[in-house]
Amino acid sequence: MCLSLGQRCGRHSNCCGYLCCFYDKCVVTAIGCGHY
């Protein structure tokens, strides 16, 4: 199961496809999200 845009995420949760976890929220990878 993956998390959608804007959902809270953590070290052990995965955001869906093109999203990544940034400051505890799933955001679009293009914004830039460190190396997660």
From Swiss-Prot:
Example GO molecular function: toxin activity
Q: Which cysteines are joined by disulfide bonds?
A: C2-C16, C9-C21, C15-C26, C20-C33
Q: Where in the body, by tissue, does this protein show up?
A: Expressed by the venom duct.
Database matches in InterPro entries: Conotoxin-I_CS (IPR013141)
User: Does Secreted appear among the keywords?
Assistant: yes
Cross-referenced PROSITE patterns: I_CONOTOXIN
- Predominant location: secreted
Where found, per UniProt? Secreted
Keyword list, A-Z: Disulfide bond, Ion channel impairing toxin, Neurotoxin, Secreted, Toxin
Entry superkingdom: Eukaryota
Instruction: Identify the GO cellular component terms for this protein.
Output: extracellular region
User: What does the sequence similarity comment in the record state about its family?
Assistant: Belongs to the conotoxin I1 superfamily.
- Please provide the record's free-text comment about the domains of this protein: The cysteine framework is XI (C-C-CC-CC-C-C).
What is the protein's name according to its record?
Answer: Conotoxin Bt11.4
What is the organism field in this record? Conus betulinus (Beech cone)
What broad taxonomic lineage does this protein's source fall under? Eukaryota, Metazoa, Spiralia, Lophotrochozoa, Mollusca
